[in-house]
Design a protein with these regions (language model features):
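A polyanion-binding, active-site-adjacent surface
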Residues: 1-143
Length: 143
């Protein structure tokens, strides 16, 4: 679906992500989405290190141009690549990190990827908790 539309998170993953956003009062019109890798790897596999290495500078430039007040990284590959970590989402979610752009620090939160949640519905409860925390940040900061 994403290949046809050119829009990140447009298939089943996208439907769940849209629902998740609506839970905290957001929608696709007041958020910016970008994939870490700008093409679908063959066989819908996880992007390899070389593909990430090629695309990461462009993704970082997107973040620099957009200048978000809050960055929500979706899934472990995005989180580990952007923040230069090597941890599971399970260890990273529920915590606040920062991403530096020049002199500005951007708050970062990490959530499970919707495809993971579709296959592991038990983790949805943790994700709703994470979204509630993100919602509080948005409300407190008046984004």
């Amino acid at each position: 679906e994403e290949d046809r539309s050119g829009i990140p998170f447009s298939g089943e993953d996208g439907k769940l992500l849209t629902l998740m956003l609506s839970y905290i009062g957001l929608n696709r019109n007041n958020c910016y989405f970008s994939n870490l890798v700008f093409w679908r790897p063959p066989g819908n596999r996880v992007p390899n290190k070389e593909e990430i290495k090629i695309c990461l500078p462009f993704t970082r430039e997107h973040i620099k141009i957009i200048q978000p007040k809050l960055l929500v990284l979706v899934g472990g590959i995005a989180a580990n690549s952007i923040l230069n970590f090597s941890e599971s989402v399970t260890k990273l979610r529920g915590r606040e990190f920062s991403y530096q752009i020049k002199e500005k620090k951007i708050k970062v939160h990490i959530i499970y990827h919707p495809s993971f949640l579709i296959n592991s519905p038990i983790e949805k409860k943790r994700t709703w908790f994470d979204l509630t925390e993100i919602s509080k940040i948005i409300e407190n900061e008046k984004y």
